[in-house]
Design a protein with these regions (language model features):
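Short acidic (Asp/Glu) and glycine-rich catalytic loops that position anionic groups and cofactors
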Residues: 40-42, 245-248, 292, 300-304, ...
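A glycine-rich phosphate-binding loop feature that marks nucleotide/adenosyl-phosphate handling sites
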Residues: 81-84, 287-290, 340-342, 375-382, ...
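N-terminal, positively charged nucleic-acid-binding surface of large information/translation enzymes
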Residues: 1-159, 165, 545
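Basic, alpha-helical terminal appendages of large translation-related enzymes
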Residues: 75-80, 84-85, 96-115, 119, ...
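Structured secondary-structure scaffolds
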Residues: 1-2, 54-58, 126-367, 414-416
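A non-catalytic, amphipathic alpha-helix used as a structural packing/dimerization or gating element
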Residues: 24-35, 61, 353-360, 395, ...
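Solvent-exposed, amphipathic alpha-helical segments
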Residues: 159, 392-403, 415-422, 426-429
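Long, amphipathic alpha-helical stalk/connector segments used for oligomerization, subunit docking
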Residues: 330-349, 357, 364-412
């Protein structure tokens, strides 16, 4: 279950930038997201969106329950107001210096550098309007509704203690939530002065003045967004309550970056608790740290990094991307995306280990020795050597299952690759080749039969990670998918079964492509900064030399009694400035800004 979170200031801001309506923008990006996930072979029962009728109905119903149960309070506050645009500026329309870390481009609701979300737009230093950076916001009073998280804290804390323990949350998810609770929860505004969003249900207000105040306000995106999981389910099935109103029989697993944790571990659960209704609540929270790019940070605005829509353009199959990204999933610490490493892991791991193991065995069975028919491997199947080999495979399988049950996805992938290595070691230790088949046919048949069944098991355990690879293995084996067993027998593909023809699972990536891709997708930030600084320095030196030359020429002309003029582009020089000043005014125009 997934979808696009479409309401909020970010949407309004982007729509303004692109010159379209918020609805047009959301339609565009919902399709882009859906197409990317389809290409990556990420499957959902439904990939939905939050700008729907169901979202409005469910969000407003939760709000009414909170209102009735006295968990909401109205507060007047001072908010930034743009006199030029005649409107209050929502958090994301304000940018400035983060009060926590000093980052100069922090938003009014969140700092992308340090991750802080526990400050307001008025806390920013050197605040400016995002729409028009030359405008400095003024402060005016506005009224908003807040959820009383302080009153809900004891219940949130009790729920969190139980859920995080039973659900074995990721450590960073627990630490972030504990930090919020330790500081003490405060009431938090859940309405905003925006147009694009879920409207406030005015029927809860008895006073006409209140209705007038709130008729042009909408819900804060992070009160509204988490309800999207529920509304998207409701878009999928009319029986959505069987999933979301059955806490005893349904377990909710959620996956996210660490900066979104508080909204899912505090605000949304608090909203659910406050309705006094039975809700399916978060069971397991799987959170990640940050994936960085070439020793720097990904940045869409600066074009640094390869993003989902770029991956397809490289011509590299989705499974290679899935393997690398899952192997580098930042589960416990930040990780790096590096092109050299990306290429190396395709060539030395996917191709050299998994690909070659599968190809070697299937080609052997395709050969004249077996004519694509699985030999009778039963004669020596119970031999202690082979029993021990199957035991080792089962040990790797057990570790894999344990990792997957704990949602340790990176470890699960490594466990699967360890099983492949065990398979490779198995056939190498027995020197499986034409000579063994000729001299010891029973032993060769047993090694081949066990190896074929290891490959069959690989198709199953790699399916969550490499679906296209899994499908190709099964097609080559001409065998059905094997549900991942708790214990592997090594006998699922029987003697006499005819397999298909061998195909390569992976291809070599030319290491020379590293430079091409690094240049195409921005390279390292350090290199980009170095180039920008060098260009700026060169431009400044050139401008200074030009200014010096103009000054020298001006003096010479002055000595000759000739009126000196200087030009700046196609414009005449300022008559109130000396010639040198007129020329140096152009320096800023050619200076490249560092970033």
């Amino acid at each position: 279950m997934c979808g696009t979170d479409e309401y909020g200031t970010a949407t309004e801001t982007k729509a303004l930038e692109e010159g379209v309506t918020p609805r047009e923008l959301c339609d565009k990006y919902n399709k882009i997201h859906a197409d990317i996930y389809e290409w990556f072979e990420i499957g959902f029962d439904i990939f939905g969106r939050t700008s729907t009728r169901q979202q409005k109905e469910i969000t407003q119903d939760i709000f009414r329950r909170l209102y009735e149960n006295d968990f909401l309070i109205e507060r007047a506050s001072q908010q930034p107001y743009c006199e030029k645009h005649k409107s209050f500026l929502a958090d994301r329309y304000i940018e400035g210096t983060c009060p926590k870390c000093g980052y100069e481009d922090a938003r009014g609701d969140q700092c992308d550098k340090c991750g802080s979300v526990d400050y307001g737009p008025l806390d920013l230093k050197n605040a400016r309007c995002k729409i028009d950076p030359d405008e400095t916001p003024v402060v005016r009073e506005t009224r908003h509704i807040h959820i009383r998280l302080d009153r809900l804290q004891p219940e949130i804390e009790k729920w969190f203690t139980q859920a995080s323990d039973k659900g074995a949350w990721s450590n960073n998810g627990k630490v972030i939530t504990e930090s919020w609770l330790k500081q003490g929860l405060r009431d938090r505004g859940i309405t905003r002065d925006l147009r694009w969003g879920t409207p406030i249900p005015l029927d809860v207000f008895s006073d006409d003045t209140d209705k007038e105040i709130y008729k042009d306000k909408v819900f804060y995106v992070w009160f509204d967004a988490c309800i999207g999981y529920v509304s998207i389910t409701a878009n999928y099935t009319a029986d959505w309550e069987k999933w979301w109103r059955d806490p005893d029989n349904v377990k909710l697993y959620q996956f996210m970056g660490k900066d979104n944790v508080p909204f899912h571990s505090v605000i949304f659960p608090g909203s659910q608790i406050g309705t006094r209704e039975p809700w399916t609540m978060l069971h397991h929270l799987s959170t990640t740290e940050y994936l960085n790019y070439e020793n720097g940070k990904f940045s869409k605005s600066r074009g640094v990094g390869v993003f989902g829509n770029n991956a397809k353009d490289t011509g590299i199959p989705p499974d290679v991307w899935r393997y690398y990204l899952l192997k580098h999933r930042p589960e416990t610490a930040d990780t790096q995306f590096e092109w050299r490493d990306f290429i190396a892991q395709n060539n030395s791991e996917l191709l050299a280990k998994l690909g070659n193991f599968v190809n070697r065995i299937i080609k052997l069975v395709n050969s004249k020795i077996y004519n694509s028919i699985i030999p009778d491997y039963t004669a020596m199947h119970s031999d202690p050597v082979f029993v021990e080999a199957k035991k080792e495979i089962n040990q790797h399988l057990t570790r894999y299952l344990k990792s997957m049950e704990a949602v340790n996805l990176r470890d699960g992938l490594q466990d699967a690759m360890d099983l492949v290595q065990a398979g490779n070691n198995f056939i190498q230790s027995h020197k499986l080749d034409n000579k063994l088949a000729a001299n010891e046919p029973e032993k060769a048949a047993t090694v081949t039969g066990i190896a074929i069944n290891i490959i069959h098991l690989c198709a199953s355990i790699f399916e969550p990670y490499l679906p296209a690879t899994s499908k190709s293995i099964l097609e080559q084996l001409e065998a059905p998918f094997l549900p991942i067993p708790e214990h592997w027998s090594g006998e699922d593909i029987k003697p006499g079964h005819q397999i298909g023809k061998a195909k390569y699972l992976f291809t070599q990536i030319d290491p020379k492509r590293e430079d091409e891709w690094r240049e195409m997708y921005g390279g390292t930030q350090a290199e980009r900064l170095k180039k920008e600084e060098a260009s700026a320095k060169k431009a400044a030196q050139k401008a200074a030399a030009k200014a010096k030359k103009a000054e020298s020429k001006g003096k010479k002309l002055g000595e000759q009694g000739v009126e000196a003029t200087a030009t700046q582009g196609a414009k005449p020089a300022d008559p109130n400035k000396e010639p040198v000043d007129a020329v140096t005014d152009g320096v800023q125009q050619v200076m490249l800004p560092s970033s």
